[in-house]
Amino acid sequence: MAEEQQANGAAAENQQQQVQFAIQRIYAKDISFETPSSPAIFRKEWKPDLKLDLNVKHEKIEDGVYEVVLTLTATNKVEDDVAFLCEVHQAGIFTIGEEVQDGQLAHMLGSFCPNILFPYARECVSNLVNRATFPQLNLAPVNFDAIFQRHMQQQAEQAQGQQTADA
């Protein structure tokens, strides 16, 4: 009996330590696809030069509710001509418990949520490229944790540089 109460107490403690997190909605906020060099681009030998840009923004909607927007821009050039320009704003509304501390919240908004959104954005880009009859584009996974850590390190260095300049 005492063991059962101890197990129940441990389970309750684990539930209290878990962060409340829920996905309310994932949606395409904005989609753009351009082929400025068509139809001439289709006659050129396909030697693409792909450039990818990622951006993450977040906004507090209400207490504990955040919109995170992952912007994925793919620009593909053949020689000096833009074959296509694809931009997808993949968004999500997430509930994050009030018990989350600032550093943990920044990590969830800057890394965890974009990791959830990226497969949707990647699929959208792939479908748009396919519909435009270009060769298939399969984007590699992105390590948002590493990007977030690098961003935090750059901010810390800038803050330290600012303090040194002010001294």
UniProtKB/Swiss-Prot annotation:
One Gene Ontology MF term: unfolded protein binding
Which Pfam families does the entry mention? SecB
Q: Which SUPFAM superfamilies match?
A: SecB-like
Q: Would the keyword Protein transport turn up in this protein's UniProt record?
A: yes
* Biological processes annotated in GO: protein folding; protein tetramerization; protein transport
Cite the Gene3D superfamilies for this sequence.
SecB-like (3.10.420.10)
GO annotation, cellular component aspect: cytoplasm
Tell me yes or no: is Acyltransferase among this UniProt entry's keywords: no
What keywords appear on the UniProt entry? Chaperone, Cytoplasm, Protein transport, Translocation, Transport
Coiled-coil portions:
none
Locations listed in the record: Cytoplasm
Q: Which NCBIfam families match?
A: PRK05751.1-4, secB
The task this protein performs is described as: One of the proteins required for the normal export of preproteins out of the cell cytoplasm. It is a molecular chaperone that binds to a subset of precursor proteins, maintaining them in a translocation-competent state. It also specifically binds to its receptor SecA.
**Which family, according to UniProt?**
Belongs to the SecB family.
UniProt name for this protein: Protein-export protein SecB
**Naturally occurring in which organism (per UniProt):** Idiomarina loihiensis (strain ATCC BAA-735 / DSM 15497 / L2-TR)
* This protein's encoding gene: secB
